[in-house]
UniProtKB/Swiss-Prot annotation:
Membrane topology: Multi-pass membrane protein
UniProt entry tagged with the keyword Cell inner membrane: yes
Annotated GO biological process: intracellular protein transmembrane transport; protein secretion; protein targeting; protein transport by the Sec complex
Name recorded for this polypeptide: Protein translocase subunit SecE
Stored Pfam families: SecE (PF00584)
Biological source species: Salmonella typhimurium (strain LT2 / SGSC1412 / ATCC 700720)
C-alpha cells in the first residue's frame, strides 16, 4: 500500500515540475521580450513563439494536457457525426430570422413612440 502511495506522490511531483517548467517558459518569454526590446521585432516574435510552443508542448505532456487532447479528439469525432443542414435549409432559416427581426424592430419602434408620447403628455415636456 505504501509503495502505491509513493508512486502517486512521485507522479504528482513530476506533474508539478512540468507545470513549473511551463510557467518558467512563459515568464522567460514575457521578460525576455521586455528585456530585449531593442532587438529586431521579428527575432523577438520568433523567440516568443518558440517559447510559447515549448510551453504548450510541455503542458500537453501533463495529465491535464493529455485529457485535453483526448477531449479535442472526441469533439472532432462528434462534429463529424453531426448532420449539417443543407444550403437551402440554411437560407430559409436565415430569411425567417431576418423577417422576425424586422417585425420585432418595427413593433419595438412603435411601442417606443407610443411611450415617448405618453410620457411627454404626462410630464408636459415636448420631445
Amino acid at each position: 500500500m505504501s509503495a502505491n502511495t509513493e508512486a502517486q506522490g512521485s507522479g504528482r511531483g513530476l506533474e508539478a515540475m512540468k507545470w513549473i517548467v511551463v510557467a518558467i517558459l512563459l515568464i522567460v518569454a514575457i521578460v525576455g521580450n521586455y528585456l530585449y526590446r531593442d532587438m529586431m521585432l521579428p527575432l523577438r516574435a520568433l523567440a516568443v513563439v518558440i517559447l510559447i510552443a515549448a510551453a504548450g508542448g510541455v503542458a500537453l505532456l501533463t495529465t491535464k494536457g493529455k485529457a485535453t487532447v483526448a477531449f479535442a479528439r472526441e469533439a472532432r469525432t462528434e462534429v463529424r457525426k453531426v448532420i449539417w443542414p443543407t444550403r437551402q435549409e440554411t437560407l430559409h432559416t436565415t430569411l425567417i430570422v431576418a423577417a422576425v427581426t424586422a417585425v420585432m424592430s418595427l413593433i419595438l419602434w412603435g411601442l417606443d413612440g407610443i411611450l415617448v408620447r405618453l410620457v411627454s403628455f404626462i410630464t408636459g415636456l415636448r420631445f
